[in-house]
A protein has these predicted regions:
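Catalytic cores of phosphodiester-bond hydrolases, prominently lipid phosphodiesterases
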Residues: 2-203
């Protein structure tokens, strides 16, 4: 008999999407006049699918409907922006989502979507691995060729009504600075306090 490892996963009932995210967000929206931050812009909640796409979407769809009053609504011809905009990443069920006339979430696409036909009302974001597109790791010179490539990528997405995010890159200020200058919409980081200081200090 071969040796094997089994991993037992315990799901704690208090650690649900509702308890950790949606309920606290809803409380803030109610307390702040219809916004997560009083007087602030829409808030984005990125949900990364790690399990089978369609069954997960069926469960998530039912959950989101209970919070419809604070969520952005997407349809074939319009987006009704609300306090919280949900975007699904990872193994998301694009065909199932696209088949719905009205939905409470959009999809986080990839660079191929910039050349495809998917509506920005379905694929609202485009996210890519920084290391697959750029050689620069935040040290030394960011070449003009790569800087132009970055800005062209961002401009193309914005022209289509999509927002841009990069993941997998070095989590350093030099990368943040170039992304911010190029108009990248969402800067990925695990250094929240440092990024906050950087953004507040950068015009």
């Amino acid at each position: 008999m071969r040796q094997a490892r089994a991993r037992v996963v315990q799901v704690r009932p208090e650690r649900t999407l509702e308890a950790l995210y949606l309920d606290p967000l809803q409380a803030r929206v109610r307390a702040n006049g219809g916004r997560v931050f009083a007087g602030g812009p829409e808030f984005h909640l990125l949900i990364d699918f790690k399990t089978e796409a369609e069954p997960t979407w069926q469960v998530l769809q039912a959950v989101l409907e209970r919070y419809a009053g604070m969520l952005t609504t997407f349809s074939a011809d319009r987006v009704e922006t609300n306090a919280v905009t949900v975007v699904m990443s990872g193994n998301s069920p694009r065909a199932a989502v696209a088949s719905l006339p009205v939905r409470r979430a959009a999809i986080d696409g990839r660079k191929g979507d910039l050349e495809g036909s998917a509506s920005p009302r379905l694929v609202a974001w485009v996210s890519e691995n920084w290391r697959e597109l750029f050689h620069w790791r935040g040290e030394g010179e960011f070449t003009e060729a790569e800087r132009t490539k970055l800005r062209t990528f961002v401009d193309q997405a914005h022209a289509q009504g999509r927002r841009i995010r990069f993941w997998g890159g070095p989590d350093v200020e030099s990368i943040w600075r170039e992304q911010r200058a190029a108009g990248v919409d969402f800067i990925n980081t695990d250094r929240l306090a440092d990024l906050r200081r950087f953004l507040l200090a950068t015009p």
